[in-house]
Regions:
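Transmembrane helix-loop-helix hairpins at membrane boundaries of multipass inner-membrane proteins
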Residues: 2-3, 18-101, 105-115, 194, ...
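Central hydrophobic cores of alpha-helical transmembrane segments in multi-pass inner-membrane proteins
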Residues: 5-20, 32-45, 89-103, 120-122, ...
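Alpha-helical transmembrane segments and their helix-start/interface "positive-inside/aromatic belt" motifs
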Residues: 25-37, 161-171, 370-375, 453-462
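Hydrophobic alpha-helical membrane-insertion segments
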Residues: 33-50, 170-181, 373, 377-385, ...
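Membrane-interface helix-loop-helix modules in multi-pass inner-membrane proteins
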Residues: 61-87, 133-136, 140-148, 385, ...
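Hydrophobic transmembrane alpha-helices and their helix-loop junctions in integral membrane proteins
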Residues: 98-104, 122-134, 147-435
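Cytoplasmic/organellar membrane-interface segments at the starts of transmembrane helices
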Residues: 370-372, 429-494
């Protein structure tokens, strides 16, 4: 069996184990064992990948395997990874592991919740290892479907509305995506749906590219919170349970940026060059609009949701700059934002579970009441605003340096506008930290609250360690990513 198939096999075994498990201890045991196995497998894969590259293996995709699945449509179970895929698998495993501990005390219907959570995880892992267009689309759909139930059943607030809105908008994006994938396949003249074969043939007519590229980019862009198709994510974040928000913002939204880069831009480079300016304007709006909107929110989850729109917009903004440095920064931003936003949502969930409110106006003085959670919130905020030494700084600096490599007025003007989001982010983060953590607590109930439990500390400490590790030692992963974006970028350079 190919090693990459472990990332699909382990979730399948977890589903079987959860189905048979009786009692909360058995359910937790299955989840911790499975999540730990996925994390170990992702770390092992990272070392295997780096070892292969060090040994001189220059293949575009490593650890490839192809198994014919459905001959009439030339569909194969084709897997393979490069540095981008490895980074995304590592991120996904970290979020699944920490999300398991963040859901440790979830009630009711714990087994059913973890079944859907695991199915969502399987879709994410399967998507990142796939190099067949249809298989990628299949795992993409597997990742989306559980969100409806996870939010609609275990969510809070307007959860039914949020779940339906999310499902309808993402399924609408999937329709665009399916049309785009079929157009790419039939337009390329390829004998399979393997994206490497389609890229090597490089014979999709330009006129067709100009049709399929916008459809494919929009299909993935909806999931990446591209303006003006971002509204589903705001209500989805606000209503989702803690671990689902972590996986949703931390990993699921990254499928959008990954798909735009890996499929839309890689397979249709001429159209990407011709039409990128349209989407650059939209992503520039996403970056600034998300940051400004976060400034006026009073709900902790909505603040982080709008912040995610801004940061995910920066990912798409960077890949549309069509150069290696900016594209490397985009992948680093996916990693950084995935870790930061998972940390934020975990902390917000822990605070809400104690105070039963997410309204900033009702929170104050938490530093004295919950010092551990408060200090962790400060660290998350500093990472979000780009403090040197944490992951946000290296990702954003790489993006802006890469963006300025375009010498024309249009690209540099948009880059300057996008850079303003740094200042805006600092405004809402510092205001938020000052308001809820310091000052005088006026709610007597809050004075009796307890700090983080051991399971919450495990989740939070792991995420902080990753945020700090990426910020202080980014070279190894940025080098791994930079090598892998080069084949895509070389197609994009006119």
């Amino acid at each position: 069996m190919n090693f990459l198939s472990i990332f699909v096999l382990i979730p399948l075994l977890m589903l079987a184990g959860l189905w048979a498990a009786q009692g909360i201890k058995a359910i937790r045991g299955v989840m911790v064992t499975g999540a730990s196995a996925l994390l170990i497998a992702s770390v092992v894969l990272t070392f295997m990948y780096l070892g292969e590259r060090s040994a001189g293996n220059t293949a575009e995709m490593l650890f490839r395997a192809d198994t014919l699945w459905y001959a009439p449509l030339h569909i194969s179970y084709s897997v393979g990874v490069d540095g981008i895929s490895v980074a995304m698998l590592l991120l996904s495993a970290i979020i699944v592991f920490t999300g398991t501990f963040a859901s440790w005390r979830l009630q009711p219907l714990t087994k059913e919740y973890f079944l859907w959570f695991t199915l969502l995880s399987m879709g994410v892992f399967g998507f990142f290892i796939s190099i067949d267009l249809f298989t990628m689309f299949m795992f993409y759909e597997i990742a989306l479907i559980p969100m409806y139930l996870l939010i609609g059943v275990w969510g809070s607030g307007r959860k039914e509305y949020a779940a339906m809105k999310l499902t309808l908008m993402l399924m609408g994006g999937s329709a665009f995506l399916l049309i785009g994938i079929l157009g790419i396949y039939f337009g390329s003249g390829a004998t399979t749906m393997n994206l490497l074969e389609i890229a090597q043939l490089h014979n999709i007519p330009f006129a067709q590219q100009c049709i399929w590229f916008p459809l494919t980019f929009l299909g993935f862009g909806v999931l990446g919170a591209l303006f003006p198709f971002h509204t589903w994510s705001l209500d989805g974040h606000a209503s989702a349970p803690t671990a689902v928000s972590m996986l949703h913002a931390g990993v699921l939204m990254k499928l959008g940026g990954y798909g735009c880069f890996r499929i839309a831009m890689y397979l249709m480079p001429e159209a990407a060059n011709e039409l990128s300016w349209i989407f650059l304007i939209l992503t520039g709006i996403s970056v600034v609009y998300g940051a400004f909107s976060a400034c006026v929110q009073t709900d902790l989850k909505y603040i982080n949701a709008y912040s995610s729109v801004s940061h995910c917009g920066l990912v798409l903004f960077a890949i549309l700059m069509l150069n290696q440095t900016a594209a490397t920064g985009a992948i680093l931003q996916m990693l950084s934002h995935g870790l930061m936003t998972a940390l934020f949502f975990a902390l917000i969930g822990m605070i809400y579970g104690r105070t039963h409110t997410r309204d900033v106006r009702e929170l104050a003085g938490l530093m004295k009441i919950m010092p551990f959670l408060s200090v962790c919130y400060v660290i998350a905020g500093l990472a979000n605003l780009g403090l040197p030494g944490l992951s946000g700084f290296i990702a954003e600096m790489t993006i802006f340096v890469g963006s300025f490599q375009n010498n024309d007025v249009f690209h540099r003007t948009l880059t300057i506008i996008a850079c303003s989001s740094i200042v805006i982010t600092a405004v809402y983060i510092l205001r938020l930290v000052g308001k809820i953590l310091y000052g005088t607590c006026t709610n007597k109930h809050h004075l009796t609250l307890t700090d983080a439990t051991w399971d919450e500390r495990v989740a939070v400490i792991c995420l902080i360690a990753c945020v700090a590790g990426l910020g202080m030692a980014p070279f190894w992963i940025s080098h791994m990513i930079g090598e892998s974006v080069l084949p895509v970028v070389s197609q994009l350079i006119p």
